């Protein structure tokens, strides 16, 4: 099996780490794209924590050594070079565009939980029509607040992607942030936290830009 770790650019040398199953890392080129892979004798098999950690470690090492990395999620394995090349060839143009998008960037995740308990607590005394009107007011307020939280972070981001999340989530997003703006992004998150003590704001990262591999350009 051939395990794919990602598409890279400006990688001078492979990192001195082993891949999944302790296989050495290799480079190969398909349609002008530089891929980092490793080989494992056995087919697939059970997914282990060690394999997941090995994959994540390789991607992190590539992020530290490359101008751009388009990371592959764990499980992108191919039986041989021909199957790998065929899979990459069909998506080569899109991969090249997305590689350009993520160049020099890191991913940060944001989850915001905000309650509307006041509206919920009073809903028992409302008629059906009044309840629906009250809920509409609450939802409009939630959408407005979500935009207010998003816009200052989007200003520092090259792209963003929003996810559905749980019903209690006011917003759940990923932001593609240039490395030089990472500290400023963190500062803005902290200002949002200070300005909205009633909300739970959780920022994670930096991560490899997994959320933008399939999305291409986000909502920005």
Feature annotation, model-predicted:
Residues 1-220:
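An interfacial alpha-helical scaffold signature
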